[in-house]
Amino acid sequence: MDIKLGKYKPTKEEYIKSFKDMLLLRRFEEKCGQLYGMGEIGGFCHLYIGQEAVISAIDMVKQKGDSTITSYRDHAHIILAGTEPKYVLAELMGRATGCSKGKGGSMHLFNVPNKFYGGHGIVGAQVPIGTGLAFVEKYNDTHNICFTFLGDGAVNQGQVYEAFNMAALWGLPVVYIIENNEYSMGTSVARSTFMRDLYKKGASFGIKGFQLDGMDFEEMYDGSKQAAEYVRENSFPLILEVKTYRYRGHSMSDPAKYRSKEEVEQYKERDPLVIIRKTILDNKYVTEADLKAIEQSVKEIVKEAVEFSENSPLPDEGELYTQVYC
């Protein structure tokens, strides 16, 4: 099986939905950055700004029953998995109404009913768990698959290769999505791994891999749909390396001095949100006024999330003793 781009193209409705989804993620993350600067959000906070086309496309090709797991840059993933933004923001602000009851914060978002299993703070630790989720699907013969996200830094973790081996050995239905945003914290891919084509990392286990442009929604949609079909039909893992870029630092505490302004601006010229907006207008899918209405609705959603979170109570002290295991 090879991914041959051009097989699938998003529908008019999917373009419009993706624009709204990506815009919501962008405005939500921008608001998170603002609230962090105001001291309303504490701890670590990793923003997804610039990478929205990746999760938007994956969400389009998911089927009901599929599961998702990712690392600590997880705000976008849980929102598109079906969690209302207000419950995500409440969690970031440490409120009892948050999706993890105010105890998980930015890096440990969960919504098990929606089959979103985190939000994991240890680099690469989610990969064996995602592999285990795929095992459950195979064991129960559900024909569901697990989308397991990891970053370019995680591919240097030993447990990732142990997971690859078991997934191939047992024929597990998992898509490993390597979100390669060029930097593992402040360390470039060129400085951290000899094999820079990360999609080839599973070759020794017989796992096929493909590289996609993560800044291009159309390519992401096409390639991701083919990848999901392959994994679902063959019950065998596959690796997608998506070349993407984060506009902000690794976290809110990172000034990102290890890269130039010119480099960042070069990627911003390929901003997926700008490109999909232009595509929609060029094809006359909707009017400028329609897009303005979408932008206003997104603004209201984010505003509601802020108001809800600010008016939500802090967790009761008794929560210190719940969900604690010895």
Curated annotation (Swiss-Prot):
GO terms for biological process: pyruvate decarboxylation to acetyl-CoA. InterPro entries: DH_E1, PDH_E1_Alpha_Subunit, Pyrv_DH_E1_asu_subgrp-y, THDP-binding. GO terms for molecular function: pyruvate dehydrogenase (acetyl-transferring) activity. It catalyses: N(6)-[(R)-lipoyl]-L-lysyl-[protein] + pyruvate + H(+) = N(6)-[(R)-S(8)-acetyldihydrolipoyl]-L-lysyl-[protein] + CO2. It comes from the Bacteria. Gene3D superfamilies: 3.40.50.970. Its EC number is 1.2.4.1. Disulfide bonds: none annotated. Its cofactor is thiamine diphosphate. GO terms for cellular component: intracellular membrane-bounded organelle. Heterodimer of an alpha and a beta chain. The pyruvate dehydrogenase complex catalyzes the overall conversion of pyruvate to acetyl-CoA and CO(2). It contains multiple copies of three enzymatic components: pyruvate dehydrogenase (E1), dihydrolipoamide acetyltransferase (E2) and lipoamide dehydrogenase (E3). This is Pyruvate dehydrogenase E1 component subunit alpha.
